[in-house]
Amino acid sequence: MRCDRCARDTIHPIESRALDRSRILFLLCCYKRRPRFRFHVHQWWWWVAMEVPELVKLAFARVQRVEPEHVGKIFGVMLLREPDEDELVQLAYGPEATLLAKIEDTKAALTVIYARCSAAAAHGPPGGGGVGVGGGGGYHQQPQQLFSRPPVPACGGVRHHYSPAAAAAAAFGYQVQSPQYWPDSPPAPPTKAAQQEFAPPGLVVDASAEGPYPLRGGQHVLDDNNFGGGYYYPAGEDAFPNGGGGGGGSPARARRSNGLSTRRPCHYFSKGICKNGQNCHYSHHQVYQDALAGAAINGDVYNHQPGGVTPGSLETLEMEITELLNSRRGQPVSIASLPTLYGEKYGKGLQADGYLTESQRHGKAGYSLTRLLSRLNKIRVIERPHGQHSVVLAEDAAKYMDFRGGGGGGGGDTGSVPASSHQIYLTFPAESTFAEDDVANYFGQYGPVRDVRIPCQERRMFGFVSFQSPETVSTILMRRNPHFICGSRVLVKPYREKSKCVDRTCVDNIKSMVPYCPPRFFEFDQELYTAEYDASRLMRKQLAEKREMLLEMERRRATVRRLESMPPQFAYFDCSIEDASPLHSLQDDSKQLDLMNPSLASPDPLEIVSNSQAPPTQAGNIYDDHESNQIELLPESPFAASAPAGNSISTII
């Protein structure tokens, strides 16, 4: 017949039977996989009438000589794999062994397709139509369109499944049932009779082979990790190595067919430091289920308690953390670093259902893990000097809670003296080289040092020193800045408690998490920080008032001494500097005052030690540091040194 649009001679497949099925399969493959072949209908049938390449003809003839009964199925799968020109040359002119190996691989793929399609047909809806086509070979024929997806119903809650492997199997000439819905339970493995019924003659199915779907000769093409629920088609992936026949996507998309989560496990959650919680893009469910499965294997009791852990797992966790703390000689371990140390020691993640472990001073909530650890009997949760929560053995908790008030670990009064009165804040250059021991030795001159902490950073510029007695802190703050430790200039400032910031930041973050997180994420005691914050605020207020009182008293003493020592002739300042030369008399008076007040004239031995460690260019320079806080600096005596000649009379004042 002649096409009216393209004015070319075309051959309709219904009117002419000259085209065999292998050529039609090859054309269908090209039509599906190659966009450039998607012409109009009249152009499509005109392309069908074209001659198939000679290589395909020769390869088809060789396969037909070996497998005359199933040449259409075998050669169709070969063409669906989209062989390039070299592979076609191997099929057409290669050795006989290569051809036989290709045919055997194709038979194995066909066996898998038959087995999978039989399992899918067993779960098809009643009256579901087949998708088989065109005829011959005694197989059922139905005039349905190839590669057509099942219609989507009006309800949006039912997902439909389409398997290109099943459509390709239907194109090979047999009837399969197309599943119209996702079943609630995975299908049962096909029986040997069903496999033999769908398998072509000459293909032997080994029923004694292991696995849910045995294959020919015990060769396992299916992998239990690659499919689930009876709806993953590895044969389709094998037939389409470029991803064209395995459901149009990766194995992860194919695994989505059975309803399981395709998200990968969260690496940070397995280590206990995932900050995204339920909003994480990765899966937390699989990691937690693995932990529960391991607990069941070890004989743990499976009675769930609030917090997502079991009593048996709590005992195991307590024993492991106790062993970890004993290996560190009882030193406190911060909750932020506990999961990392736990993973390094035991090779598994320290995890409870949905907790966070970031430090509260960074504005992250870590209540769930803190509450979990507080349930352990042999471990106490304490609050360290600068706002971090740490875990310590119960027998060692008293050493760290005597001035902190318990910190939530039990024991002690929450209204005791805050840490701000026991420690100081240090600032120093980034190029300093001294260690924590050097800082402890230097400040040990003022009083017993409890702890020195310098954060491990690439450019360290601050640190904290805590003392046994608050009087030591007051003594150091009354000294003049700077201090010199190993030649480095160190400034000392009072440590300010950040309990108020902790309360506000944590509560604000918890409130912001309300629309996104379940209620168990913000189960915490708001009274944990209230009493401590009130006590620290009162102590800071008292300390500031005491400091202001001392400064005011010192100013008054200095003013009285200056007025009493001033000669009568200089009581009035209406004379000029040239007429009255008070400098000589002022020097004599200052010498007399130095003899009367040896505490003002003689230098402090601690100050001598500090200046002796300073560099040569700085040891002799006594100056005020504008960077330091002006509150804790005592005023200098106006008679400590004589003023140079030529100064104004304001020097005396």
Curated annotation (Swiss-Prot):
Intrachain disulfide bonds: none
Any GO MF annotation of the entry: DNA binding
HTH OST-type domain span: 313-396
Domain RRM: from-to ranges: 422-497
Database matches in PROSITE patterns: HTH_OST, RRM, ZF_C3H1
Region (Disordered), start-end ranges: 242-261, 598-623
Keywords from the named record: Coiled coil, DNA-binding, Metal-binding, RNA-binding, Zinc, Zinc-finger
Organism domain of life: Eukaryota
Coiled-coil positions: 537-565
InterPro entries: AtC3H46-like_PABC-like, AtC3H46-like_RRM, Nucleotide-bd_a/b_plait_sf, OST-HTH/LOTUS_dom, RBD_domain_sf, RRM_dom, Znf_CCCH, Znf_CCCH_sf
Record-annotated membrane-spanning stretches: none
SMART domains: RRM (SM00360)
Signal peptide coordinates: none
Bias type Polar residues, positions: 609-620
Gene3D superfamilies reported for this sequence: 3.30.70.330, Pneumovirus matrix protein 2 (M2), zinc-binding domain
Zinc finger boundaries on the chain: C3H1-type: 260-287
UniProt protein name: Zinc finger CCCH domain-containing protein 54
Native species: Oryza sativa subsp. japonica
